[in-house]
């Protein structure tokens, strides 16, 4: 959904950064539906990238840099239409990639109408759950935050942008 949220752009003119490439599932799906979009990923473990290409069909035209995602953002100036945060340490998002400072850095690397997507690998309900804390942190940085449960999965996707029109795509 994230590529559809960036208004008035052809997908060939869009670019996406994935922090925490893992097996490349998100990149593979985006290539399937938005094939001409420019896409790159950052994965801290080269062995994971090698496995993703060998066993999970990560497309060859998706550039993957072996680096820490937060350090990568700090080292570059590029702006993106979509930044996907999908980094995990065991089953949780690493602390250094779940703070206000980190999400502010992500925002600095988005275009004015850009969208950040965070893959939350578990659904939580009720007050005080980890997803609520993460949503509150992101809401302190972005003007618009929306979460969507992924059908047939335990995943929940969080979309964040300062562009209020992005909400219309999700409704």
Model-derived segments and spans:
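Soluble small-group transferase modules, centered on the S-adenosyl donor enzyme superfamily
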Residues: 1, 5-7, 144-171
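The AdoMet/dcAdoMet-binding core of the Class I SAM-like
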Residues: 1-117, 121, 125-135, 139-141, ...
